[in-house]
């Protein structure tokens, strides 16, 4: 069987990648045809074909976030590569090993006005350094790049392919799945001393990890952080900021002496106030090159701890009381009919329906904050969310990538493990094209996407933009109502659709998806005009 030099190079590129990968996302194109045919001839790779490079890159991101190993997205030259920038940006800031493998014209065509030709070298800048492969002797650069901390960042592999691109015969099937060679590499910032006899609070966010020495310390944990042994509700931060409270003649200090930040917490303004309070000693623990210190006053930075002393019982009681006050306040406010059916009610229903072994993907903006307020993280439930740059784009594709990665872990099970995604309506519509899955492609077998549809940007109701004095221009600039018929949208893409107008409707629909798995979208029709008052009431419960 004859092959072209371009096909020979493509084969060597995929061969260099194959020890590190299990999945490939492939986009149609001419210049990348040698890479496409080579990938489809490999029996050791799961291939997912998508026609939109932007969606494809986010699908690869969703897969890679769960697998914690590289997932390449392969495309042709030109703007096809540019469309990967949003996913690359999230991957870079979330330290996810996304690989963009782009086909390119040979060097002699760059700058000549040749069709579909741009300078693709370093197109992503420092976010994803370019590895140029223009000849077989360059292929070794791929292994070198993957060995130099690719686990901490995305990479761009730019493969220059000259004509003729492909021979008239298909390559033979080959490749045998073996163990994937990929080791997560972390940055070690050293060890820090921690005196637990002081009033200490841990704040854990995305990219946090379990630290045995701090297990007994009261912890505000975001949904994507490990489950805390001694959890503190995030709204309790407002209570802890009081400094002192008095009752029955006693004065109790509520402000912590020492805060330990683990990972990358970003969700709640009250928590941010604690982190940036210059009167509170701050230690930041990180295993990446990102140090989460928004107030720029960290006293110490490390990756490991050496502890002395024990937590004071009085401090533990204060944190428990503050957390209980916040959690009870959430339940009381949600029970009030005057607030209607909001996104927070949707999050509560989703949380209540989760079981051990379920996986959650949550879009940025209100949904992830709402899940945090209603109690996540839960034991036995993994939560994934784009917290690197916290954008809503690519959410549908990432949710699908999450579900596909989870079901690939259990190929022999009759029923794939359940994945539940919570998205706002703008996040869903923004990436509606992610619903397009070809008839020959792997499909999620047990994915439920819940869309909290308040017909616009509900988060802006809670921010300064929602102030009464700005209402006359709020809807057009921030509310951005769209009136999209989500039922018709799902029908166009062949996705099962359900509608929930009330909390009870939603609970029933979620229960049905447990009994009858598949790929389903549930639209929860909510209101947003009460969100500002609801949030104000929640905050008042702990102030």
Curated annotation (Swiss-Prot):
The keyword Transferase applies. The keyword Ribosomal protein does not apply. Its EC number is 2.2.1.9. CDD domains: TPP_PYR_MenD, TPP_SHCHC_synthase. GO terms for molecular function: 2-succinyl-5-enolpyruvyl-6-hydroxy-3-cyclohexene-1-carboxylic-acid synthase activity; magnesium ion binding; manganese ion binding; thiamine pyrophosphate binding. It is an enzyme of class 2 (transferase). GO terms for biological process: menaquinone biosynthetic process. Binds 1 thiamine pyrophosphate per subunit. Its cofactor is Mg(2+); Mn(2+); thiamine diphosphate. Homodimer. This is 2-succinyl-5-enolpyruvyl-6-hydroxy-3-cyclohexene-1-carboxylate synthase.
